[in-house]
Amino acid sequence: MAGQTTVDSRRQPPEEVDVLVVGAGFSGLYALYRLRELGRSVHVIETAGDVGGVWYWNRYPGARCDIESIEYCYSFSEEVLQEWNWTERYASQPEILRYINFVADKFDLRSGITFHTTVTAAAFDEATNTWTVDTNHGDRIRARYLIMASGQLSVPQLPNFPGLKDFAGNLYHTGNWPHEPVDFSGQRVGVIGTGSSGIQVSPQIAKQAAELFVFQRTPHFAVPARNAPLDPEFLADLKKRYAEFREESRNTPGGTHRYQGPKSALEVSDEELVETLERYWQEGGPDILAAYRDILRDRDANERVAEFIRNKIRNTVRDPEVAERLVPKGYPFGTKRLILEIDYYEMFNRDNVHLVDTLSAPIETITPRGVRTSEREYELDSLVLATGFDALTGALFKIDIRGVGNVALKEKWAAGPRTYLGLSTAGFPNLFFIAGPGSPSALSNMLVSIEQHVEWVTDHIAYMFKNGLTRSEAVLEKEDEWVEHVNEIADETLYPMTASWYTGANVPGKPRVFMLYVGGFHRYRQICDEVAAKGYEGFVLT
């Protein structure tokens, strides 16, 4: 199941740098670019064989972004904004990876990256206020600052079904897909998981496979993407005001041009509700989540919108029994990540597609021949695991990160992640996270969050060097206040009611803690700016 790499040579990392960055996805590349611009010595360590991060590994058929391409891109370079032309409303994985490569080539970023290399440990030296970082190749690098740009969805979560290693057929995980095309023609294929990757990959497999079995435990809410080619005239007009357009997105709750409807879903008639939601449905995309101001705050308001979507599913899938099993129930709409689908529900009208409800007939074991549930065995040629990721903390915990007093980050966060502003954590000086727990992160346009975080962290590092300071550490009391604030705001919404990867519920044994800041990107950005303006209030600088 290992993914193949694409760059053959391995660059020897330097022994000492001002800043070491872990990860060469969108976050790490921008950190590298910006620190170079600020005149600091910087190097990036990356496990993969090339740039791309999540878009390097997730090459499964149908993979695409759920943020519109014109907003899911860097805004720091006017040249890049003008030179690159997106072709679709929602860019596919190959196009996003081409874009990342375009940026890496344009700014010669690969010259500052060591590929094929995994950071295994990082320890803070209190005597020198530096980090000592070890890799799986025996490299040891000393850095004043350590930036974790290791991604929110970079550690695939494998199911703990007995017998998984005994399966004799082809086994794939959507989060670590082969680089060469996979042909499912004539095969009996099983897909386990119906989150974002499962809903994206299944319709593509259904076009090839002789038979497709979709193993579903929890139905998800999915709405039409209405993906389409972008009009060249539209792009030309947009580029005349692209910088202004992107700045507007930085002043919104989600970091995109999605605006909250002013009305309550409880104050409108059935006719008005259906008319409004139908308009969003036909337009496609996730904006239906913002159709009314109380969708994510009031259970009754949420239920009215949820039932509209359930009826859409019932009206799409011809078999009423299958349709009802696909209808999400038992949790509020939008509290799991809203999925954009292309032909997913229509797929179940195909004769070669079968839904297996594992709530009523749980998977008991993986056999050499396929999947056995409590009812029967399904013989398969290929099995696709669309079982998600150990989100937000998974990549951090794969590294033995030790701070003051040799305390491990994994130990400090044993009951759940604790950060100040999502940027740093007390007891771990000179360590910064990009789009980590306690920040808007995955609840926002990731590119907007990434740029804001990278700019804040690199500005802070520049401030430290300018003022002859060598140690920046979050104050524990401020961290506690921030965690309390994050939880208070989350508790004003319906999010914590639902078991999701936002709360770590998809990983056995992981603490159930809501890990994201739901107060809005614009509000979060303002808080971070105020902290910086006050001489980095909440940090002890020495």
Swiss-Prot record:
Keyword Cell inner membrane listed: no
Top-rank lineage group of the source organism: Bacteria
Higher taxonomy: Bacteria, Bacillati, Actinomycetota, Actinomycetes, Streptosporangiales
Activity-pH dependence: Optimum pH is 8.0.
UniProt feature coiled coil, ranges: none
This protein's name: Phenylacetone monooxygenase
Keywords on record: FAD, Flavoprotein, Monooxygenase, NADP, Oxidoreductase
GO molecular function: flavin adenine dinucleotide binding; N,N-dimethylaniline monooxygenase activity; NADP binding; phenylacetone monooxygenase activity
Binding site for NADP(+): 64-66, 194-200, 217-218, 336-337, 501
Function in brief: Catalyzes a Baeyer-Villiger oxidation reaction, i.e. the insertion of an oxygen atom into a carbon-carbon bond adjacent to a carbonyl, which converts ketones to esters. Is most efficient with phenylacetone as substrate, leading to the formation of benzyl acetate. Can also oxidize other aromatic ketones (benzylacetone, alpha-methylphenylacetone and 4-hydroxyacetophenone), some aliphatic ketones (dodecan-2-one and bicyclohept-2-en-6-one) and sulfides (e.g. methyl 4-tolylsulfide).
Top-rank EC class of the record's enzyme: oxidoreductase
Entry EC number(s): 1.14.13.92
Known cofactor(s): FAD
Family: Belongs to the FAD-binding monooxygenase family.
Site (Transition state stabilizer): R337
Quaternary data: Monomer.
InterPro entries: FAD-binding_Monooxygenases, FAD/NAD-bd_sf, Flavin_mOase-like
Cofactor note (record): Binds 1 FAD per subunit.
